[in-house]
């Protein structure tokens, strides 16, 4: 298995991540780790893997769902705390589409998991109406107004949480 582009030392973390924005019948699918905020589904890009290949792999691993990667709509430079260390993350966000909607529930909440640093992370996958995005915290927050606008222009944002 290829190594994720995720570098850590005692002083900082660098992360290269990709997220898939899956909207189906007026609802968006988000992931929610236990005791954390909602987030766009995705993961770390592996060495020599394209962002599209990563999204296809991540949706397969976490949801057992086949997707079609449609269009890059945002690029984020994100600075946030990773435990006690600062993290500098570069992230790309794409619109994605289910190839076969019968592969996963298309309403409500269902469960899955991810592995990060050899640790299993339990996740809830939640379908929320686009209207609900205005009233909840979703990471990264800067991306939500762009999603709600319906624009397919590439949006660049910087998020400084540290």
What residue spans do the PLM features occupy?
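A cytosolic small-molecule/anion-sensing beta-strand core signal
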Residues: 24
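Charged phosphate-binding loop/patch that engages nucleotide di/tri-phosphates or the phosphate backbone
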Residues: 136-162
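A short gly/proline-enriched turn/hairpin at secondary-structure junctions
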Residues: 39-42
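Unchanged
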Residues: 45-68, 79-136
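C-terminal lobe/hinge of AMP-binding adenylation domains
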Residues: 33-35
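Acidic, metal-coordinating catalytic segment for phosphate/diphosphate chemistry
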Residues: 1-19
């Amino acid at each position: 298995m290829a190594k994720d582009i995720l570098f850590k030392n005692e002083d900082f973390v660098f992360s290269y991540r990709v997220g898939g924005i899956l909207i189906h019948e007026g609802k968006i699918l988000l992931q929610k780790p236990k005791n954390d905020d909602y987030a766009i589904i995705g993961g770390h890009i592996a060495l020599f893997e394209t962002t599209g290949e990563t999204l296809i792999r991540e949706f397969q691993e976490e949801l057992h769902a086949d997707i079609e990667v449609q269009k890059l709509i945002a690029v984020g430079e994100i600075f946030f705390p990773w435990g006690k260390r600062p993290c500098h993350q570069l992230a790309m966000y794409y619109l994605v589409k289910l190839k076969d909607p019968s592969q996963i529930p298309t309403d409500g909440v269902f469960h899955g998991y991810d592995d990060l640093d050899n640790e299993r992370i339990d996740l809830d996958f939640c379908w929320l109406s686009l209207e609900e995005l205005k009233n909840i915290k979703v990471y990264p927050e800067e991306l939500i107004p762009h999603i709600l606008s319906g624009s397919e222009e590439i949006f660049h944002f910087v998020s400084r949480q540290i």
